[in-house]
Regions:
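Membrane-interface alpha helices of multi-pass inner-membrane proteins
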Residues: 26, 141-145, 165-167, 175-189, ...
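Transmembrane-helix motifs of polytopic, lipid-linked glycan transferases
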Residues: 107-127
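Short hydrophobic/aromatic helix or loop-helix immediately within or flanking a transmembrane segment
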Residues: 64-103, 107
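Membrane-interface transmembrane helices that cradle and orient dolichyl/undecaprenyl
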Residues: 161-175, 279-288
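Transmembrane catalytic cores of multi-pass membrane glycosyltransferases
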Residues: 50, 189-287
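C-terminal luminal/periplasmic domains and tails of membrane-associated envelope-modifying transferases
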Residues: 357-363, 367-390, 400-404, 411-549
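Transmembrane-helix signature of polytopic, membrane-embedded enzymes
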Residues: 20, 120-143
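Signature aromatic-anchored transmembrane alpha helix within multi-pass, membrane-resident enzymes
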Residues: 225-229, 320-354
Length: 549
């Protein structure tokens, strides 16, 4: 009999090519311009600590931080925790920005999230020995990782979570858990997620021992995991992350932010697909499924159901479970199919790289009130200022120390935030609150662009009958009002407030047409309320044109 033919294999260059295309695709996906409001908080605080060689206590950036009384029992503790729990991350972020500029920051972010996806796929590859299962796991992780593509220290948390996962899977150099947690617990408070991994793998080893099948390295695992847990307390807050997680649930300020809302479960999404799909696979493969995978799944799925910001955990555990237990793909992919896979990935890579949002190595300057800040500096204005929450971080970076913030994203004062909410959302109560704080300057935009809601304070200020506030500056991003304009500054007519709202919404639609609700709220709320039917019709038409793209 003739010898059996050798199995056909793909050329040696194909897999490296596929890996390169996948990495380039992910880098392109995660490299949009710098636009997150909280980025500037980390840069400003990091710069201050780097220059002053101390933690930012007392707070140097907001003039309202220590006003009023606490609203819930742990508020002072939470404030102290928020001021110092990510000090190392903020300094490192500042140094990246100072050394590499916007390009360095964008590329660092893209590299961190790409590595998060890549290590997830690598763990699957180590488990299965299957190249394509690992690759698909990395791409599946990317579907959810897009939601964290912001310039915040938490991107390093998710990267370190996968690094820890790899250490626990390899079981080599478990001692690395100790320096990992020392670094991590000073970089960002998300290191508590690493404790979940320690618990899952140690729990698996303990259950195996009870079953009479002890793992060979269980003592080493327990020792270094315990030391890793203790190392998480080597930071300025010690083990403050534990009570802080409960304290956050008491805060109206935290719970008003979208990222702390529960994720919608009535919409099709990659999150639901990965969460439910991985559970189905666990049940289907229950005889093979590792106890650690069950424990990680229920812990991270539970966290993800509590807040949108935790959905990313499913981006790691979902692909890990799915592609660890589904049949290996390489066994069924013939060389022709592997070439087709590479061709498909090439098309996807080309689309990602040529996307308008790929490799935007810049700041989304259109979102920030640079013109208004220049006006304040030009006229040496440093009176107590009321600003919108979304701009607080940027003002810390660009307007401090001349102006300090009323509120910003650090969530430091609950009573001040509630007063802020009254001013921005309820114009009938606004003047009394502004008088209470002695505010002399208002720096405003017209909308909360995620929902499109119009800040009602603008409606009050557009009323010609109110004379306390004068419009002194307006462009397509911001408006500045003052009680007493400086010499040489001629107030603008109140009607220009509405012109400012129109200009802001038009500019937003040009840059971010996927969020067109400012046009909707002008058309179906503000202008009908003011009796301006022609303007209302115009903005409804703009909304329908943009929404229908």
């Amino acid at each position: 009999m003739p010898p059996a033919p050798k199995p056909t294999t793909s050329p040696s260059w194909l897999k490296p090519l596929i890996l390169g295309l996948a990495a380039l695709t992910l880098m392109a996906m995660f490299s949009a311009e710098i636009s997150d409001a909280d980025t500037w908080i980390h840069l400003a605080v990091g710069k201050w600590m780097f220059q002053h060689h101390q933690l930012p206590i007392p707070d140097p950036f907001a003039w309202t931080t220590y006003m009023g009384k606490s609203v819930y029992p742990d508020e002072y503790f939470t404030r102290d925790f928020n001021l110092k729990h990510e000090w190392l991350g903020q300094i490192i972020f500042y140094l990246i920005f100072a050394g590499g500029g916007p390009a360095g920051m964008v590329l660092f972010r893209a590299a961190c999230i790409t590595a998060f996806c890549g290590i997830t796929g690598w763990v699957v590859y180590r488990r299965t020995g299957d190249f394509y299962s690992g690759l698909l796991a990395a791409l599946a992780a990317a579907t959810i990782a897009r939601s964290i593509a912001n310039d915040r220290p938490y991107i390093v948390t998710y990267l370190l979570l996968t690094v820890e996962l790899l250490i626990l899977e390899r079981r080599r150099a478990l001692w690395l858990l100790v320096p990992l947690f020392i670094f991590w617990s000073n970089f960002h408070g998300g290191y508590f997620a690493g404790w979940i991994l320690l618990g899952a793998y140690c729990g698996e080893a303990l259950i195996d021992r009870f079953r009479g099948k002890p793992q060979a390295d269980e003592r080493s695992l327990w020792l270094w995991s315990g030391l890793g847990f203790l190392a998480g307390g080597v930071n300025p807050t010690l083990f403050g992350i534990i009570p802080a997680m409960f304290a956050y649930r008491q805060s109206f300020m935290q719970n008003s932010l979208r990222e702390w809302h529960v994720p919608p479960l009535n919409q099709l999404s990659w999150y639901l697909a990965l969460m439910l799909g991985s559970l189905i696979v666990l049940v289907w493969q229950r005889r093979r499924a590792r106890i650690a995978d069950w424990l990680m799944y229920f812990a991270f799925a539970g966290l993800s159901l509590m807040a949108l910001r935790n959905v990313i955990f499913i981006g790691m555990i979902g692909p890990l479970i799915l592609f660890s237990y589904l049949p290996p793909l390489e066994r069924v992919l013939k060389p022709a199919a592997q070439y087709a896979f590479a061709a498909l990935l090439l098309v996807g890579c080309a689309a990602a790289v040529t996307s308008p949002k790929a490799f935007q190595l810049r700041v989304a300057s259109w979102k920030y009130p640079d013109g208004a800040i220049a006006f304040l500096k030009q006229h040496n204005i440093s009176a107590p200022m009321f600003n919108l929450y979304e701009w607080g971080g940027y003002l810390m970076w660009a307007a401090w120390p001349q102006e300090k913030t009323f509120v910003d994203g650090r969530a430091l004062n609950e009573s001040v935030f509630r007063d802020y909410w009254d001013v921005s959302q309820n114009h009938t109560n606004a003047q009394a609150v502004l008088d209470k704080y002695g505010v002399e300057v208002l720096l405003l935009e017209g909308f909360e662009y995620g929902t499109g809601n119009v800040y009602l304070l603008n409606a009050m200020l557009a009323d010609p009958s109110q004379t306390k506030w004068k419009l002194v500056f307006q462009d397509k991003t911001a408006m500045v009002f003052m009680r007493n304009p400086p010499p040489g500054v001629q107030p603008l007519p109140p009607a220009r407030v509405l012109d400012g709202l129109d200009a802001q919404c038009a500019d937003h639609l040009e840059h971010q047409p996927e969020l067109p609700n400012c046009a909707l709220r002008l058309g179906n709320f503000l202008y009908p309320k003011l009796g301006m039917q022609q303007k209302a019709a115009y903005w409804m038409q703009r909304y329908e044109q943009t929404h229908g793209r």
